[in-house]
Design a protein with these regions (language model features):
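Extracellular or lumenal secretory-pathway regions
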Residues: 1-254, 260-445
Length: 445
């Protein structure tokens, strides 16, 4: 990892090989639910809408203590050539501002609830709204959200709940990682995050520590099957583990496949402190992980797509979930000598948490439910051909060539030694004969 070398130059200006596939959920029984003839919303997956994630590494500094500090920035760019669906299509979706704010105020006093209900009635806010796909992703606002963000900015710090806008709005952080030959087993794992040894999301250091975490662009070197990798994605709000699954062959190289376990979002059974529920809150069912600290305290939890491996009682609160382990699980394929990921795929679903909102008449039918908002898949589809060629030379060609070259050098060295000994012996023999010849010459001569 030095300027001018291929690994550094590839990392500093990474090729755009990460695709973001966004899936949103459309409410298909909008009229029936609004008129009360049906009490459970039916969701239909719409997508994918495909974006390319642009990654930028800037302000790069090599530190004297064997670390590298840089600022990482990510943004999503729509790819028209890869899409068949229009961003102008209409959706029927939950009113995130109304449901989120009533859930946030679920424990408020009677007077707060009364005043809020008056505001909602005056603005004619409904629990379901019609909106374009583009606005749902990038520009989701309404009069209630604008009003609240101005009146109580400490409680409502944003006036735009576009889901991709919330993910990428503040996706710029300073990261310090270990590099150098003395850090093989912790190569490119975090030492500091925004100048601290913790993320700042959790009060418990076990959940909040940055140690061993990696952003997934590179993993540590000399990866073994016994290693547990630690992947950090900001919108997951914590580090998630990856475990060895099997050996594979990728691009002609021997690789290891690590997977994200299906119980990743399950709470620990031993009673230890978990990283899935905020202190003081009622624990979420298995398969749901709190992410509100990463989204301005907006009540949201993460899960695997379509509630895969989530408590069935949660899945049955809505219609339309179709979990598929093959489609919705995650993995990464790594070349173990260098720790370079050759391919990776991971899915995550964001769900709105609606607490007991019986005190708010427009939304009381949503009380104590988890409503899927969207799910996205991050797919690193490969690495550039020049990097493939370099990797193949380093991990396949070079070891074999090294053995042959070493053998040739041994033969050459032995031959040169033999020639040297032979020449030395010839010179020594000539010297002896010359001495004998001079010693036997007649004195008269």
């Amino acid at each position: 990892m030095r300027k001018g070398f291929p690994a550094f130059e590839w990392w500093a200006d990474p090729p755009q090989e990460v695709l973001v596939r966004m899936y949103v959920f459309n409410v298909t029984n909008y009229d029936e639910f609004m008129n009360g003839s049906q009490t459970k919303i039916h969701l239909q997956e719409v997508g994918p809408y495909i974006f390319r994630e642009k990654i930028e590494h800037k302000d790069i500094r090599l530190n004297e203590n064997g670390t590298l500090t840089y600022t990482t920035k990510r943004r999503a760019v729509f790819e028209p050539d890869l899409n068949t669906l229009s961003l102008n299509a209409s959706l029927n979706v939950p009113n995130l501002a109304l449901l989120g704010m009533t859930s946030y105020l679920s424990g408020a006093s009677f007077f707060v609830k009364f005043a809020f209900n008056l505001v909602v009635r005056k603005m004619d806010m409904q629990p379901l709204v019609k909106i374009s796909v583009y606005d749902y992703l990038w520009n989701n606002s309404n009069s209630l959200l604008t009003f609240a963000s101005k009146m109580v900015p400490n409680m409502i710090p944003v006036d735009n709940l576009g889901v991709l806008h919330m993910i990428y709005r503040t996706y710029e952080d300073e990261v310090t990682v270990f590099i150098g030959p003395n850090n093989t087993k912790r190569f490119f794992t975090m030492d500091m995050y925004n100048g601290k040894n913790r993320f700042g999301y959790w009060s418990n250091m076990t959940c909040d520590s940055v140690k061993l975490a990696t952003e997934g662009v590179l993993y540590h070197q000399e990866v073994s099957k016994e290693d547990k990798l630690h992947f950090f994605r900001k919108n997951l709000c914590r580090v998630t583990p990856l475990y060895f699954a099997n050996e594979t062959v990728n691009l002609g190289m021997s690789t290891y496949r690590y997977v994200l376990p299906l119980d990743t979002f399950h709470r620990p059974k031993d009673g230890s402190h978990d990283c899935y529920t905020l202190p003081g809150d009622k624990p979420h069912p298995d398969g749901l992980s709190e992410i509100s600290p990463c989204f301005y305290d907006f009540p949201m939890v993460a899960s695997l797509p379509h509630f895969l491996a989530v408590d069935p009682a949660v899945r049955n609160q809505v219609d339309g979930m179709q979990p598929d382990e093959e489609k919705h699980s995650g993995y990464v394929t790594i070349e173990p000598n260098t720790g370079l990921p050759l391919e990776s795929k991971a899915g995550m679903q964001c769900n709105l948490v609606v607490k007991n909102v019986d005190g708010y008449s427009p939304v009381k039918s949503f009380s104590n439910t988890y409503i899927p908002i969207f799910w996205l898949q991050l797919h690193q589809v490969g690495i550039p051909q020049y990097l493939v060629s370099m990797m193949y030379f380093v991990v396949v060609v070079l070891p074999n060539v090294q053995g042959v070259v070493s053998a040739l050098l041994v033969v050459l060295g032995t031959s040169l030694l033999a020639i040297g000994v032979f020449r030395f012996q010839r010179k020594a023999t000539k010297a002896v004969y010359s001495y004998i010849s001079l010693d036997t010459v007649p004195s008269s001569i």
